[in-house]
Amino acid sequence: MKNKSIFGLLVNPFTRIAGWQAFGLGLVFVALMGFIGASSGIAFDGVFDMHMFEITVQQAFIYLAIDLASLVLVMWVTGLIVSKNFRFIDLLGTMTLAKAPFLLLAIMGYFTTAPNMNAIMRDPYVIFHSTSFVIMMILTLPVMVWSITLMVNALKISCGLKGSTLTVAFIVGLFVSEIIAKILIHYVV
Protein backbone atom coordinates (compact mmCIF):
# COMPACT_ATOMS: atom_id res chain seq x y z
CA MET A 1 0.00 0.00 0.00
CA LYS A 2 2.85 2.37 0.83
CA ASN A 3 4.46 1.82 -2.60
CA LYS A 4 1.19 2.75 -4.32
CA SER A 5 1.02 5.99 -2.36
CA ILE A 6 4.64 6.88 -3.20
CA PHE A 7 4.04 6.15 -6.90
CA GLY A 8 0.84 8.21 -6.73
CA LEU A 9 2.76 11.17 -5.33
CA LEU A 10 5.43 10.83 -8.01
CA VAL A 11 2.88 11.09 -10.83
CA ASN A 12 0.44 13.45 -9.11
CA PRO A 13 1.87 15.32 -6.12
CA PHE A 14 -0.70 18.07 -6.73
CA THR A 15 -3.29 16.34 -4.57
CA ARG A 16 -1.01 17.27 -1.66
CA ILE A 17 0.90 20.35 -2.82
CA ALA A 18 -0.12 23.30 -4.98
CA GLY A 19 0.01 27.07 -4.99
CA TRP A 20 2.90 28.86 -3.35
CA GLN A 21 4.38 25.67 -1.86
CA ALA A 22 4.52 23.95 -5.25
CA PHE A 23 5.90 27.13 -6.82
CA GLY A 24 8.66 27.41 -4.21
CA LEU A 25 9.64 23.76 -4.51
CA GLY A 26 9.43 23.97 -8.30
CA LEU A 27 11.75 27.00 -8.30
CA VAL A 28 14.31 25.02 -6.29
CA PHE A 29 14.23 22.28 -8.96
CA VAL A 30 14.41 24.85 -11.79
CA ALA A 31 17.36 26.62 -10.13
CA LEU A 32 19.18 23.30 -9.74
CA MET A 33 18.40 22.48 -13.38
CA GLY A 34 19.91 25.81 -14.42
CA PHE A 35 23.13 25.50 -12.44
CA ILE A 36 23.67 21.79 -13.01
CA GLY A 37 22.61 21.97 -16.66
CA ALA A 38 25.05 24.81 -17.36
CA SER A 39 27.94 22.96 -15.76
CA SER A 40 27.08 19.58 -17.31
CA GLY A 41 26.38 20.88 -20.82
CA ILE A 42 22.62 20.34 -20.85
CA ALA A 43 20.40 23.10 -22.27
CA PHE A 44 16.65 23.04 -21.66
CA ASP A 45 15.82 25.03 -24.77
CA GLY A 46 12.13 24.24 -25.03
CA VAL A 47 9.15 23.48 -22.83
CA PHE A 48 9.64 19.73 -23.08
CA ASP A 49 13.02 19.18 -24.67
CA MET A 50 16.73 19.46 -24.03
CA HIS A 51 19.95 19.38 -26.00
CA MET A 52 23.59 18.84 -25.16
CA PHE A 53 25.83 21.84 -25.78
CA GLU A 54 27.93 24.24 -23.79
CA ILE A 55 25.98 27.13 -22.29
CA THR A 56 26.61 29.74 -19.64
CA VAL A 57 24.65 29.90 -16.41
CA GLN A 58 23.02 33.09 -17.69
CA GLN A 59 21.89 31.37 -20.91
CA ALA A 60 20.62 28.38 -18.93
CA PHE A 61 18.42 30.61 -16.79
CA ILE A 62 17.20 32.62 -19.77
CA TYR A 63 16.16 29.37 -21.47
CA LEU A 64 14.42 28.13 -18.33
CA ALA A 65 12.66 31.46 -17.73
CA ILE A 66 11.36 31.52 -21.30
CA ASP A 67 10.30 27.87 -21.11
CA LEU A 68 8.48 28.29 -17.83
CA ALA A 69 6.86 31.62 -18.74
CA SER A 70 5.65 30.20 -22.06
CA LEU A 71 4.24 27.10 -20.41
CA VAL A 72 2.52 28.90 -17.55
CA LEU A 73 1.08 31.75 -19.62
CA VAL A 74 -0.25 29.49 -22.37
CA MET A 75 -1.78 27.10 -19.83
CA TRP A 76 -3.26 30.09 -17.99
CA VAL A 77 -4.94 31.30 -21.20
CA THR A 78 -6.04 27.71 -21.83
CA GLY A 79 -7.51 27.60 -18.33
CA LEU A 80 -9.35 30.87 -18.90
CA ILE A 81 -10.90 29.45 -22.06
CA VAL A 82 -11.97 26.02 -20.77
CA SER A 83 -12.40 26.40 -17.01
CA LYS A 84 -14.86 28.42 -15.01
CA ASN A 85 -12.91 28.77 -11.81
CA PHE A 86 -9.22 28.34 -10.98
CA ARG A 87 -6.44 30.22 -9.25
CA PHE A 88 -3.44 31.42 -11.24
CA ILE A 89 -1.08 30.63 -8.36
CA ASP A 90 -2.17 26.98 -8.36
CA LEU A 91 -1.43 26.71 -12.08
CA LEU A 92 1.88 28.56 -11.66
CA GLY A 93 2.97 26.32 -8.80
CA THR A 94 1.94 23.01 -10.29
CA MET A 95 3.37 23.74 -13.75
CA THR A 96 6.66 24.89 -12.21
CA LEU A 97 6.91 21.73 -10.12
CA ALA A 98 6.05 19.62 -13.19
CA LYS A 99 9.47 20.57 -14.64
CA ALA A 100 11.25 18.74 -11.76
CA PRO A 101 11.95 15.43 -13.57
CA PHE A 102 14.22 17.24 -16.03
CA LEU A 103 16.70 17.66 -13.17
CA LEU A 104 17.61 13.99 -13.74
CA LEU A 105 18.71 14.82 -17.29
CA ALA A 106 20.80 17.76 -16.06
CA ILE A 107 22.59 15.44 -13.64
CA MET A 108 23.00 12.78 -16.32
CA GLY A 109 24.87 15.38 -18.41
CA TYR A 110 27.88 14.94 -16.11
CA PHE A 111 28.16 11.31 -17.15
CA THR A 112 27.39 11.68 -20.85
CA THR A 113 29.79 12.24 -23.71
CA ALA A 114 28.09 13.57 -26.80
CA PRO A 115 29.55 12.57 -30.16
CA ASN A 116 31.03 15.31 -32.33
CA MET A 117 28.34 16.93 -34.49
CA ASN A 118 30.50 16.80 -37.63
CA ALA A 119 31.05 13.07 -37.09
CA ILE A 120 27.28 12.58 -36.70
CA MET A 121 26.66 14.42 -39.98
CA ARG A 122 29.12 12.12 -41.77
CA ASP A 123 27.89 8.93 -40.10
CA PRO A 124 24.72 9.06 -37.95
CA TYR A 125 25.50 5.66 -36.44
CA VAL A 126 28.47 7.19 -34.59
CA ILE A 127 26.05 8.09 -31.77
CA PHE A 128 25.97 4.41 -30.85
CA HIS A 129 29.72 4.46 -30.14
CA SER A 130 29.08 6.48 -26.98
CA THR A 131 27.40 4.21 -24.43
CA SER A 132 26.71 7.13 -22.12
CA PHE A 133 24.96 9.02 -24.93
CA VAL A 134 22.78 6.00 -25.73
CA ILE A 135 21.86 5.67 -22.05
CA MET A 136 21.00 9.39 -22.00
CA MET A 137 18.74 8.97 -25.05
CA ILE A 138 17.00 6.01 -23.42
CA LEU A 139 16.59 7.88 -20.10
CA THR A 140 15.19 10.95 -21.85
CA LEU A 141 11.95 9.27 -22.91
CA PRO A 142 10.68 8.20 -19.46
CA VAL A 143 11.74 11.56 -18.00
CA MET A 144 9.75 13.40 -20.67
CA VAL A 145 6.75 11.11 -20.16
CA TRP A 146 6.95 11.69 -16.39
CA SER A 147 7.15 15.46 -16.83
CA ILE A 148 4.27 15.51 -19.33
CA THR A 149 2.21 13.34 -16.95
CA LEU A 150 2.88 15.88 -14.20
CA MET A 151 1.85 18.72 -16.53
CA VAL A 152 -1.41 16.95 -17.42
CA ASN A 153 -2.16 16.38 -13.74
CA ALA A 154 -1.22 19.98 -12.97
CA LEU A 155 -3.75 21.27 -15.50
CA LYS A 156 -6.34 18.72 -14.38
CA ILE A 157 -6.07 19.59 -10.68
CA SER A 158 -5.56 23.35 -11.08
CA CYS A 159 -8.40 23.92 -13.54
CA GLY A 160 -10.72 21.07 -12.58
CA LEU A 161 -10.67 19.59 -16.08
CA LYS A 162 -11.28 16.02 -17.18
CA GLY A 163 -12.00 13.89 -20.21
CA SER A 164 -11.68 15.17 -23.75
CA THR A 165 -11.65 18.81 -22.60
CA LEU A 166 -8.50 18.11 -20.58
CA THR A 167 -6.89 16.12 -23.39
CA VAL A 168 -7.50 18.68 -26.14
CA ALA A 169 -6.71 21.67 -23.92
CA PHE A 170 -3.45 20.13 -22.75
CA ILE A 171 -2.22 19.01 -26.17
CA VAL A 172 -2.98 22.36 -27.79
CA GLY A 173 -1.53 24.27 -24.83
CA LEU A 174 1.64 22.21 -24.74
CA PHE A 175 2.36 22.56 -28.45
CA VAL A 176 1.56 26.29 -28.49
CA SER A 177 3.81 26.87 -25.47
CA GLU A 178 6.64 24.89 -27.12
CA ILE A 179 6.33 26.93 -30.33
CA ILE A 180 6.29 30.22 -28.42
CA ALA A 181 9.30 29.16 -26.32
CA LYS A 182 11.30 28.14 -29.41
CA ILE A 183 10.52 31.43 -31.17
CA LEU A 184 11.41 33.52 -28.12
CA ILE A 185 14.63 31.60 -27.48
CA HIS A 186 15.62 32.04 -31.12
CA TYR A 187 15.15 35.82 -30.99
CA VAL A 188 16.24 36.53 -27.40
CA VAL A 189 19.29 34.30 -27.07
For the regions a language model picked out, list residue spans one by one.
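N-terminal juxtamembrane cytosolic/stromal segments of multi-pass membrane proteins
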Residues: 1-51
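Membrane-interface helix-boundary motifs at transmembrane edges
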Residues: 14-17, 80-91, 156-164
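Central hydrophobic cores of alpha-helical transmembrane segments
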Residues: 94-95, 165-176
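Selective recognition of hydrophobic, aromatic-rich stretches within alpha-helical transmembrane segments
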Residues: 56-74, 110-159, 163-164, 171
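Alpha-helical transmembrane segments with an aromatic anchor "belt"
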Residues: 51-113
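Juxtamembrane boundary at the C-terminal end of a transmembrane helix
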Residues: 178-189
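Hydrophobic alpha-helical transmembrane segments of multi-pass integral membrane proteins
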Residues: 24-36, 66-74, 103, 147
